[in-house]
């Protein structure tokens, strides 16, 4: 299993547009085969950093997922929405593997 972390630099004046973009991916990404952890918009601290996080089985599975996402009607619409509104100023992808496993569940005090 590999996890893709997308770091976005967004236009701070278009946070609402990014949040709509994130909600759209919340529908399209799982439908196209990735395990979506979520999209995260600025809350405290930096007003221009946002993240998207999802996992796939392998890089081959990632390529298949990307093909399905490009063919998905909402996926295509969301790509165009971002291109048209230009709220994403920069986008970087990093692929990571879990190194801390196994680890226990959260322990509440």
Locate each region found by the language model.
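Short, well-ordered beta-strand segments in beta-rich or mixed alpha/beta enzyme
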Residues: 2-9, 38-70, 93-94, 107-109
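Short, surface-exposed ligand-recognition loops at beta-strand->loop->(often short) alpha-helix junctions
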Residues: 9-20
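Residue-level signal for secondary-structure boundary sites
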Residues: 16, 60-62, 101
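An amphipathic, aromatic/His-enriched active-site/gating alpha helix that lines ligand/cofactor pockets
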Residues: 20-37, 56-94
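Acidic/histidine-enriched, glycine/proline-rich intrinsically disordered or flexible terminal extensions
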Residues: 86, 90-91, 96-109
């Amino acid at each position: 299993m590999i996890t893709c972390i997308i770091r976005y630099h967004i236009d701070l004046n278009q946070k609402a547009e990014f949040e709509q973009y994130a909600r759209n991916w919340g529908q399209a990404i799982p439908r196209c085969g990735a395990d979506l952890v979520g999209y995260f918009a600025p809350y405290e601290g930096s007003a221009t950093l946002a993240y998207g996080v999802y996992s796939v089985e392998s890089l081959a599975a990632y390529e298949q997922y990307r093909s399905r996402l490009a063919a998905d009607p909402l996926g295509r619409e969301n790509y165009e929405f971002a291109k048209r509104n230009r709220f994403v100023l920069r986008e970087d992808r990093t692929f990571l593997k879990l190194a801390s496993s196994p680890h226990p569940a959260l322990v509440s005090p």
